[in-house]
């Protein structure tokens, strides 16, 4: 059943690398008829369109530096002011810090009639499952097809089903690198989770389940959060 008549409001989606956040964000957007706003996408879009913020971000990236909070916040602010965000939107990859979360609350409060994010969904996946998903990735250098030796292996070990080329593991998919990324995410996100917990906005979903079950649990969390916000 479509949820396009449900006024869900702003949704924040949290989840570690490998949690399937991007997949779930697209499913949420399609089900409720709201835009999926990924900070990576809007950054690339601003750079491609040559906006003022995009030009500034491009100069920063060309120096090899990280794009500042102010630039990212500005791009998010411009995007959520668009008419297609009036019924709600799902933010993927933002906020990453408490400072960004506080900024988002202020930005939404300034938007006519808006409150804090209706619900913050945290897709929780066990450490071992994340390691399997990320370290098991193998890529075809010819067509870019991605396999997973644990979850979606090629028909013949080590070679692409389509062209027969030897698959390779990216340097940043090794266990050492992945383990550090996950620890870094945990350190960064813990304060953010506590921030939203205190607001009673955080809804945790078990991401170890099959995709369809995770999606169903997310929809329930969103609609429960929307109902609670509507009664405030």
Ranges and model annotations:
Residues 1-232:
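Glycine-rich phosphate-binding loop of ATP-dependent small-molecule kinases
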């Amino acid at each position: 059943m479509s949820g396009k008549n449900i006024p869900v409001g702003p949704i924040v989606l949290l989840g570690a690398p490998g949690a399937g956040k991007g997949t779930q964000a697209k499913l949420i957007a399609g089900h409720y008829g709201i835009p999926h706003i990924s900070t990576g996408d809007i950054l690339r879009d601003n750079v491609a369109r040559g906006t003022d913020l995009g030009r500034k971000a491009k100069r920063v990236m060309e120096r090899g530096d990280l794009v500042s909070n102010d630039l990212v916040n500005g791009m998010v602010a411009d995007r959520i002011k668009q008419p297609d965000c009036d019924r709600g939107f799902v933010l993927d990859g933002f906020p990453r810090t408490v400072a960004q979360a506080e900024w988002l609350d202020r930005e939404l409060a300034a938007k006519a009639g808006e409150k804090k994010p209706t619900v913050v969904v945290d897709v929780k996946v066990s450490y071992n499952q994340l390691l399997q998903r990320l370290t098991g990735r193998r890529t075809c250098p010819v067509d870019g097809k991605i396999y997973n030796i644990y979850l979606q292996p090629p028909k013949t070990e080590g070679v692409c089903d389509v062209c027969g080329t030897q698959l390779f593991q990216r340097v940043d998919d090794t266990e050492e690198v992945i383990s550090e990324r996950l620890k870094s995410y945990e350190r960064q996100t813990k304060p953010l989770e506590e921030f939203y917990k205190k607001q009673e906005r955080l809804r945790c979903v078990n991401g170890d389940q099959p995709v369809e079950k995770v999606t169903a649990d997310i929809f329930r969390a969103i609609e429960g959060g929307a109902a609670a916000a509507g009664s405030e």
